[in-house]
Amino acid sequence: MGKKGIRYCILMCGCIVMLLILNLIMGSVSIPFSATLHVIFPFLHDEVTSNLLTIHPSWEYIIMESRLPQALTALLTGAALSACGLLLQTAFRNPLAGPGIFGISSGAGLGVALVMLLLGGSVTTAAFSVSGFLAILLAAFVGAMLITLLLFFFSSMVRSSILLLIIGIMVGYVANSIISILNFYATEEGVKSYLVWGMGNFGGVSMAQMPLFASIVLLGLLAALLMMKPLNALLLGEQYAENLGINVQRTRNFLLIITGLLMAITTAFCGPIAFIGLAVPHIARLLLNTDNHLSLLPATMLTGAAVALLCNLLCILPGELGILPLNAVTPLLGAPIIIYVIMKNK
């Protein structure tokens, strides 16, 4: 990684820390920074802050059970989705390839739609029952992984990356068609529940679930970082990569597994999140002005984490008026970037 890449990553780390703090102190209930710091780091004893927390005992619960897990989820999910987008754009040499294009998000949505229909709409929009929540989580994960395995199967039969991309798009269309049919026959409550899930939300991971969620995401990100050199070779074309000794099909399959795992876990917990995986790699590429994955991949992960935290912050800005749907905010940031990329490559 060059000096420019290091400076960029340091800058992004600073932005992440600042946005993380803002996510913890802002919301429908305003909590002082000193109180937030005291809750997260109890050893930083301060008598005045301790008295404040005694007067407002709910602050600790709000921070530890709502804002902190939500901020950490946004950070990890943003990094994961952005990494998935960059992996797919490089592997298929298509600037508009993204996690949603290959139908993995649609697979997760299909799993959730099946569960909500089979439960007869018993999964309420206000709060899931324990069994309902676990069913939705498992259904989203299984649906996403099944689509990934299906793409893995086609990948063993099709050598062309372009053809595999087209197959992925078609699989996504089929999944979305089945979802539409299921919604047509579902109860009103079931349709409403599915729509709420489909809006996306970083608040789906509790502190108790965070170790599992973080472990899987970090494992996927580490696996992605190990692919930086093969990704650089793929940039120059499949034939050139093969001449360098890269097994293109095996590399492509490994990238699909990484993408499927990260998309499955993030979509299962957070719902389908639009544009972050598609737009953030272009943001990092434009700011760094490089295609070298030794710099670009870590920078994309950090940029994705910062963008997701920013989106989460924008969602909670209305305060007491409510929380904006995540997928109502992400296109506002992502769509202009995609339009710019299309116009640049016209």
Predicted regions and their residues:
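Alpha-helical transmembrane segments in inner-membrane proteins
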Residues: 1-346
